[in-house]
Amino acid sequence: MKLLILFLAALGAASARIRGHTIKG
């Protein structure tokens, strides 16, 4: 279960980064 939470957290961070990059660019 911990691994799943960690994976979701990493995915959310990557998504936020991509979203911010898209808005900036």
From Swiss-Prot:
It comes from the Eukaryota. Keywords: Behavior, Secreted, Signal. It is found in: Secreted. One of its GO terms (cellular component) is extracellular space. The keyword Mitochondrion does not apply. GO terms for biological process: negative regulation of female receptivity, post-mating; sexual reproduction. Its main location: secreted. Residues 1-16 form the signal peptide. GO terms for molecular function: hormone activity. Responsible for physiological and behavioral changes in mated female flies. This is Accessory gland protein 98AB. The gene is Acp98AB.
